[in-house]
Amino acid sequence: GRYGTIGEVFYAAEDFWPLNTTLFVENYHGNDAKFIYYFLKTLEWSKFTSASAVPGINRNTVHKEIVSLPDIETQKRIASTLSMLDEKIKTNTEINDNLADLLQTIYQERFGNDILAVNQGVLSDICSYSRDKVAVSELNVITYFSTENMLSGKAGSTEATSLPTTSQTTACHKGDTLISNIRPYFKKIVYCEDKCGCSTDVLCFTPSQPHYSAYLFSTLYADKFFAFMVAGSKGTKMPRGDKQQIMTYPVVLPSEEELAGFNTIASPLLEQIYSNRAENKRLSILRDTLLPKLMSGEINVSAVQL
C-alpha cells in the first residue's frame, strides 16, 4: 500500500488492477518473486513515508534502500518454507468456512422455519446480554475483542492492537457469542471458546443455559438475524444495533430432545473450527518469527523442519 494501508504487502498470483494508491513490482531482476514478497514484508515502510498531511510512500526513497539478498536457490528454499505455512493457514481457513456453512445448513434445516415451529419465542428467551465485568489486567491481545479486531463477513477475529485504558470491561465466557454492534451489516461475529472480554461496541450474548451455546451461535450467525439487526439499527453515518429490538428477534424454542440432537453435531463442528483457528495462530506466530531470521541469515533455511 502506498497510501492508507501503508506497508501492507500482498502477493497477486493472477492478473490484477492496481489503483494509484499502490506500488507494485513487475520486474524481479532475476530474484524469486515469492521470496521478494516475503522480503518486502520485513522492511520498515514507515521510514519511506513523506511528511505531508496525507503520508504516503516515496518510491524514490525506496529505490535507494540498500539491501542484501541470498542466492536464488536459497531464496527459493526460504520462499517454499514460508509458503508451506501460509498454505496450511489458507487450507485451515477454507475448512473452517466449509464447517461454518455446514453448521448453518443443519441449523436451517432443523430450525430455520420459525413460522411453522410448534414452540415459538424471541431471542430473549434463550439468552441475555452479559453484565459481568473483568479486569483489563487479566486480558491480553488474544482474549480482548473490539469492533476493530473482529473481522467482517463472519471471518472471526485477529489479535487486538491495544487494550482499553479503563480498569474493567465486559466479561465473556465460554459458549457466549460476540457481535459487533457498530455497522452490523459487516456481520462481525465470534464464538467464545474461552474466558475473554469485549469493548462496549461489542454485544456479548450469554445463553440462558450452557446447552444452548451452539444453538444461540447458529441463530445469530444466520444472515436473517443480521438483516433483522440492520433493520432496527439507529444512526446513519455509523449505525448501531438497537439492543432492545435485537432481543425481539423471533426464534424457535427447541425441545430438549431436538437440542440434544443438534448439539451432537454442532459441538464437534465448533470445536474443530476453534482447533483450526488455534493452529492458524500458532502457524502465524511461527511464520512471523522465522521470517526476519531467515531473511537475515540468522537461521539457515536447511535447518528448518516443518
Residue ranges and their predicted role:
Residues 43, 47, 152-154, 223, ...:
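A short secondary-structure junction motif
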